[in-house]
Regions:
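Alpha-helical structural motif
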Residues: 37-40, 76, 109, 122
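All-alpha amphipathic helical-bundle segments outside canonical DNA-binding/catalytic cores
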Residues: 72-82
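ATP/Mg2+ or Mg2+-diphosphate-binding catalytic cores
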Residues: 91-136
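Active-site acidic catalytic loop and adjacent metal/ATP-binding pocket
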Residues: 1-39
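Short flexible/disordered coil segments
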Residues: 11-17, 29, 71-72, 115-119, ...
Length: 136
């Protein structure tokens, strides 16, 4: 068995967690997969941090909360960093533009790219801080 590998939800985000007074439940296992388990944390963090302008304190608190339940190995820490560093949002927009017969119109693509550009400084600061832990 490879380090950190196991069954993953595959689309772990805030929309797939149901909170009740006595418990929380994870739903929608349509994308279940065998992967590095830290991948679920990376997907969850990306969604939350994008909505919170890559807030450093929030991101580090999410990592601490995860680590309190399951310690991350150096390999998993690097995996988390690399998965968050991948420019997923840019890739999705570029891929959509290339493959979707320009359904949105060029202005819509520019608008989405400008939004990514506005988030980039905070994203890069967060990633620089995280890189220190992943590669030290």
């Amino acid at each position: 068995k490879k380090e950190g590998m196991g069954i993953c939800h595959g689309d772990f985000n805030q929309h797939n967690i149901v909170f009740r007074s006595e418990y929380a439940a994870v739903i929608s296992f349509d994308n279940i997969c065998y992967d590095v388990q830290i991948g679920d944390l990376a997907r969850f963090m990306r969604k939350i941090l994008e909505k919170n302008n890559w807030n450093m304190g929030l991101g580090m608190e999410m990592i601490r909360a995860y680590s309190d339940k399951k310690a991350m190995s150096p390999y998993e820490t690097k995996q988390l960093y690399l998965r968050l560093a991948y420019p997923e949002k840019f890739w999705k927009i570029a891929n959509h533009y290339y493959n979707a017969n320009k359904a949105w119109g060029f202005g819509r693509y520019l608008e989405k790219l400008e939004k990514i550009k506005a988030e980039e400084e905070n994203r890069e600061q967060f990633l620089a801080y995280m890189k220190h832990f992943a590669y030290s």
